[in-house]
Amino acid sequence: SLKNVPNLRNISCIISVPLLNEIWLGSEYYPEIYRVKKEKDRIELLGTLNLSNYADNPGFPRIFYEDSKHNLWVATTKGILVKPEKEKNLQDTKFPSMDITGIGEGKDGTLWIGTRKQGVYNAIVSSNLTFEKKGLKNLTTQTDKLVSDNIGAICIDDNGLMWMGSQDGDVFTYDPRTKKVE
């Protein structure tokens, strides 16, 4: 039983990883991801990814997101790691340390990253899956008329419209084509 795994008492995030035929579980208070799969009538622990092996001060996993190219993004309390589609290991993206609340992919392949108190970032992903400062655009209440900088969740709909829910009770959209907030 997984109840005997001490660091799995509180799970912060979970995702299916079909290419590996496994499920990933993020530990709330440890820099670890647990890899599991269901075998007949029991859940089997396949192994642990210690995030400290991939980044200095990696933080704890909070959000898993798979993009259209099957790269698996792991937002932590300290930044973002990624598992490239054809790789086994995670790598550090060099995203600045901030409180990340959501990740979504735009129609153009850029990533949208919601944050608590710092608005939303639009990130051009380099070929080696890192973020460079020149490829990061920060949208805020001051610069882009967002309704709130305190973003709780984001998603991108089929038309490319970004939806945001704030931790102040607001729901609003941003259209990357027209740069309009509604």
Show which residues each predicted segment covers.
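Carboxylate-rich, polar loop motifs that coordinate divalent cations or form catalytic acidic clusters
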Residues: 1-182
